[in-house]
Structure formats: C-alpha cells, structure tokens
Amino acid sequence: MSASEHDPYDDFDRQRRVAEAPKTAGLPGTEGQYRSDFARDRARVLHSAALRRLADKTQVVGPREGDTPRTRLTHSLEVAQIGRGMAIGLGCDLDLVELAGLAHDIGHPPYGHNGERALDEVAASHGGFEGNAQNFRILTSLEPKVVDAQGLSAGLNLTRASLDAVTKYPWMRADGLGSQRRKFGFYDDDRESAVWVRQGAPPERACLEAQVMDWADDVAYSVHDVEDGVVSERIDLRVLAAEEDAAALARLGEREFSRVSADELMAAARRLSRLPVVAAVGKYDATLSASVALKRLTSELVGRFASAAIATTRAAAGPGPLVRFRADLQVPDLVRAEVAVLKILALQFIMSDPRHLETQARQRERIHRVAHRLYSGAPQTLDPVYAAAFNTAADDAARLRVVVDQIASYTEGRLERIDADQLGVSRNALD
C-alpha cells in the first residue's frame, strides 16, 4: 500500500527485513490483525529485556541514589511521552515516535555516558563504542526475538521506519575522508543492516521522527536534570538572575556548545529567570508549596520547548501529516539557547562536582577491569549466547566486540557483583 493523506506511511516503511510467519497460538476465529505494524514494534521494544535493564543504569546520578532517582529507564519513558505529544502536533505516527523515545538509550552501558567513554577506550583499536550504534545493534541482532533463514538473530526485526526513527546519527564512524567521527549510528559490523534501513533515504539526514526523538531527549534531560539538581540542593535557580553567576555559566556554555554564543546564553538566562514559574521556585525547601512550584516549572518548560518546535516546524512545512522526510524539525535559536542554559546548570553544579568526578573515575576503572577479565578468560567467562558468538568470531576485533556487547548489556548491579567477585571484596567497598 502506498502512502496517502489518510496514511502517510507506505509498505516500504512497514517492511521487516525477515518475513515472519503468522502467530499460531490464538484461539479459532481470533486471527485478525488489530494493531498497526508500528504498534507491534512499540510492544516489542516495551517487552524487551534490554529496556528493562535500563532501570539499573545511570542517567546522571546512580539509580540507587536518593528516594526517587531518575534512571535510564525513567528518562526513556519521559522522552517517549514528550515525543508522543510532539507527534500529535506534527502528524507523525504516535507509536513510531514513542517507540523511538523508548529505544533511544537502549544500548547505553552501565554508568551512562561515563560507561560509554570507558567502553570506547576498551574497544579503541577495534571500532570503538558508541551508545547510538549500540542501540541499532541491539534492535537488529542482540535482543532475541526473530531469526533468519540461516538461524542468525535478526533482533526484534522492527520495520524499516521504526529502526530509522531510532537512528539519530545515520552514518558510520569513518567519514569517508580518513577521519573518525565521535558520534555515529552504525558499527562497520552492522553495515548490511544499516544499508537496508537507509535504502532510499537522503544521505546522512535523519528522518523527522528521529529528529523529534532527539529534541524530546534534549528537552527531557535538560529540564529533569535541573529538577533533580534543585531537589538535591545542588542547583539554585536564582543564579540565573545573578548577572555575575549567569555570565560565568554563559562562558562555560560557549566552550561546551560551540554553536551558541555567550551573549545568546546570557539573554536566554535572563528570559528564563523572568518567567514567573522560575521565580516561584526561589530557594527550594521541599515543602508542599515548593514541590508544587517545582513540578509546575518542569511541566511548563517541557511545554514551552516542545510547543515551540511544533509551531515553528508547522510554520515552515505547512499543514498535513509531517512524516519521514517530508519535513525537518525546526527549533528556534532562542529556545535552543534556553535548553543549553539548563544543560550548563547541570554540568556546572552536578557533573563537575569533585565527588561525582571521583566516582566516575572508579566506574571507568571497574569497566576496564571487568573487560580484561572477560576477554582473557573467554569464552568461559561469557554468557552462553555471547560465548557462542565469541567462538565463531572471525578475528580479534570481532571477539573484542562480543566482550563489549556483553558488558554493555550489564546492569550496574551485575557489573559491580562481577567486579567484587573478581577482587574478592564486598560490593560496598567498590562504591
């Protein structure tokens, strides 16, 4: 079926790489297909073990810190919800965008971006590690659901449009000019699957659904990281109104975000500080009124940033369903600057804290120790599915990739138990 105004997605978008036989366990007379292909894809991600493991993986602070921690799982749920709301305004398929939000961090290793850095060091000589490329690898091969005619895993066997919606960086690490890119969406090992997904797509252009997911991710972690920082008393939003403090944040932001100037960041800090919902938070003291004010702030900021993108995109692209490559997401520069200010607050007052940096250093050391142990003792040290892959790997690079895949799949609890067993000490001594 070709795309139409009623259904802007076509059979090419819905195609799965491996044909699947009909289900056989249903009762007689109940064989009808009541769900769309994208709804089925969303369910596959939601029921996956890889998604559940995100409950014990760090977002900013560890999943066992505080009474109401944000984990990679809760963050993914928030991204999915924000993305779904944006999809309503743009005419994208709701299940498709929600799926992209759920799966956007599904390949992240223990300790979040810090663990990503450590695994990239472990695999530096053999293709490195990137969380977005690992997302694709999990969805197309590592998460068990479907096998092909040769008995090889096809992962969740999602539709082409679903896999593309999760692909924020639709390119390999090598740029074709002899350089290696820091952010990329596919490992060389997964080139065949990547070519299938990107067939007919404009080179290195993410589809609209992936762009929506990407902005929803930015909105979610910038707003919610600040919320968590306020609750933990690490962030005081009154710094936005203090000229000297705001100027220091702007200088830091100019170094971190090369596309935003210090003047733009200063102006953004002033705009945010003058919002009534920001001023209402004041000095947070955990009372009922303070908690209500903070929750209203997060809700209104999410709405501010998401609705600005919807309205600006609509103004540029016009009416009707906006899907796939019919439009690009448009975000006003002043809104991007405001989101950048919130990111800088978290960077300055949470991620740059010396205690946080010391913890991160120990975490990277732990990943290196476990990687060395697994590789030197493989295949006996590997789970059965990874041991089999290790035994059939063609070379050292492929064998190391198997070890990295296993570590990336670990929850933080399991990684720490393995490390403690290796060192012969209690797990608490490693924290």
UniProtKB/Swiss-Prot annotation:
One of its GO terms (biological process) is dGTP catabolic process. It holds the Pfam family HD_assoc. Keywords: Hydrolase. GO terms for molecular function: dGTPase activity. Residues 1-36 are annotated as: Disordered. It comes from the Bacteria. PROSITE patterns: HD (PS51831). Residues 1-20 have a biased composition (Basic and acidic residues). The keyword DNA repair does not apply. Residues 72-222 form the HD domain. InterPro entries: dGTPase, dGTPase-like, dNTPase_2, HD/PDEase_dom, HD_domain, PHydrolase_assoc_dom. Gene3D superfamilies: Hypothetical protein af1432. Belongs to the dGTPase family. Type 2 subfamily. PANTHER family: DEOXYGUANOSINETRIPHOSPHATE TRIPHOSPHOHYDROLASE, DEOXYNUCLEOSIDE TRIPHOSPHATE TRIPHOSPHOHYDROLASE. This is Deoxyguanosinetriphosphate triphosphohydrolase-like protein. It comes from Mycobacterium tuberculosis (strain CDC 1551 / Oshkosh).
